[in-house]
Amino acid sequence: MTTQLEQAWELAKQRFAAVGIDVEEALRQLDRLPVSMHCWQGDDVSGFENPEGSLTGGIQATGNYPGKARNASELRADLEQAMRLIPGPKRLNLHAIYLESDTPVARDQIKPEHFKNWVEWAKTNQLGLDFNPSCFSHPLSADGFTLSHADDSIRQFWIDHCKASRRVSAYFGEQLGTPSVMNIWIPDGMKDITVDRLAPRQRLLAALDEVISEKLDPAHHIDAVESKLFGIGAESYTVGSNEFYMGYATSRQTALCLDAGHFHPTEVISDKISAAMLYVPQLLLHVSRPVRWDSDHVVLLDDETQAIASEIVRHDLFDRVHIGLDFFDASINRIAAWVIGTRNMKKALLRALLEPTAELRKLEAAGDYTARLALLEEQKSLPWQAVWKMYCQRHDTPAGSEWLENVRAYEKEILSRRG
């Protein structure tokens, strides 16, 4: 340990102790909160099923930064490079289109064997895996409907895809000893004025019930459902709205996924966490950064990211909230995007753990809102950065922007050689 870091650490311990915070305990708690990194930042949501195909479903990755991963080996290598620069526990979130097979596999026929390389890799790197059926970028989703499709055969195809995905998810959990959270998001909706808003929702309700009908061990697999306000080409009507999935998760006791970009721009998911937790057993968070729409910009250490982290910590939701990231920026170095976004999420969690919440609660209960605001603002000036640097050192990762040198070297040696 360098003398400078040692001095800063000792000072930080004293400063936080003065407001009743044990920084060592904060670091222990931070190691209880893995962040699930999303594989699709590495290749702009291309996947391996049809890498040259178009991205559909009302989502978009903009930019053309060179060096994106073209196959599973490259994607895993890029993930390893990113993970070396991020301290603390991590998971990986996979979509079904990231299967590996020598021959084409229909989505309703995916099996655990198509993901065995990911499982072996996760074991080697001590990671948990999460999963998602991929209900987009496919000929049978081209008209904008999947699980709510009016055509029985097409709807059944997507039901079978989701059922197969649940078995893959359970395989992850069984093999890795940590439950896989499988999130269902569908792009279903309409571009313009919709006359019958009820029938697609009735079909979706029945389809989801069929999807989750097979009983799976909750120690291996957790079902989650995700709403969205709108997508490109589905501006007027989204079948899986917030109200639909809140009702579904509540009545079926599944996990509910809250995506930071899937609501009106004036809404924030940090305010929804405490409300949803009263009704659903678990939450999955997709931390993202919407810029005027669900643009999936790289996560910043901004007010909303901090508010999300604070809600988790203040209400001791460690065992009920699963933290995932969901952004994909193709205009910058993709490894840097992972590192920036994931480190920012972890910084926000650390800052939340360093808050004197008990004291703030007392002030709030006493109606002393002046002191509450004063303490919240003074908290921002306490030396949390020194605690972060110690955390990074203990996890053998760069503490500051020197991580960028590693990314640049990898870009020069590896990424620049990709076509």
From Swiss-Prot:
Superkingdom classification of source: Bacteria
Record pathway: Carbohydrate degradation; L-rhamnose degradation; glycerone phosphate from L-rhamnose: step 1/3
Co-factor requirement: Mn(2+)
Example of a GO MF term: L-rhamnose isomerase activity
Note on cofactor: Binds 1 Mn(2+) ion per subunit.
Pfam family for this entry, one: RhaA
Entry's Gene Ontology cellular component terms: cytoplasm
Catalytic activity: L-rhamnopyranose = L-rhamnulose
UniProt KW Cytoplasm keyword: yes
Gene3D superfamilies linked to this entry: Divalent-metal-dependent TIM barrel enzymes (3.20.20.150)
E.C. numbers: 5.3.1.14
GO terms (BP aspect): L-lyxose metabolic process; rhamnose catabolic process
Subunit architecture: Homotetramer.
Entry function: Catalyzes the interconversion of L-rhamnose and L-rhamnulose.
Family: Belongs to the rhamnose isomerase family.
Protein name stated in the entry: L-rhamnose isomerase
Name of the encoding gene: rhaA
